[in-house]
């Protein structure tokens, strides 16, 4: 539960950050009072970072944790979408992947094999249908983005992880799980930097790909 909550926060960072404009001198404000939001959810450990580029203020709860690398989990759909569009795996955000008719169960982001005990696993009904990229992005459909990663392939994915300098840049042996199983790690601070570059179309992707992804993010 902790990790899920942490990455919901990072997703919030992403959504907020894209509305920013360029900044020069950054003021840092720490907000211990934001602990109540975590306590309300029964979370004993978490962090929050809100960067207001217009006012040039970085607002933190648990600043130390915001600098700690962790699995990007669902937030990796931003990068995954950019690579898919840039490599023509997806021509646009309307690219549909057909549902194979088999509900997928996950535990801590890892797919449970067919026939295995699913008591502690979860299944999201919104994932169990044909989805376009924009629809999959909105509901954070893990099966869709796992298939996208398989189609991209390890070599191409690694090339873009390196060019963007995304976290520790590690894929490991599983092209469809590395952002879920702690192989790839990135800090919330790094995520904010990534979102600033995306907002200004400064990532090593075409302007078209970056604008399509920003448009999908506005659905969140």
Language-model segments: which ranges?
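Extracytoplasmic
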Residues: 43-45, 65-67, 71-76, 92, ...
């Amino acid at each position: 539960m902790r990790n899920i909550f942490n990455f919901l926060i990072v997703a919030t960072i992403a959504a907020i950050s894209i509305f920013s404009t360029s900044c020069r001198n950054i003021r840092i404000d720490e907000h211990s009072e934001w602990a109540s939001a975590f306590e309300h959810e029964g979370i004993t450990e978490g962090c929050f970072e809100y960067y207001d580029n217009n006012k040039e203020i970085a607002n933190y709860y648990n600043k130390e944790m915001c600098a700690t690398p962790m699995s990007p989990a669902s937030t990796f759909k931003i990068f995954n979408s950019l690579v898919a569009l840039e490599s023509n795996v997806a021509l646009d955000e309307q690219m549909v992947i057909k549902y194979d008719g088999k509900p997928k169960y996950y535990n801590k982001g890892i797919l449970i094999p067919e026939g295995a005990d699913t008591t502690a696993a979860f299944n999201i009904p919104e994932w169990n249908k044909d989805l376009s990229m924009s629809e999959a992005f909105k509901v954070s459909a893990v099966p869709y983005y796992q298939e996208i990663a398989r189609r991209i392939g390890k070599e191409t994915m690694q090339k873009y992880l390196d060019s963007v300098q995304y976290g520790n840049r590690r894929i490991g042996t599983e092209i469809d799980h590395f952002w879920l199983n702690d192989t790839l790690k990135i800090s919330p601070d790094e995520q904010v930097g990534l979102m600033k570059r995306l907002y200004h179309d400064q990532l090593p992707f075409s302007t078209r790909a970056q604008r399509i992804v920003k448009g999908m993010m506005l659905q969140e």
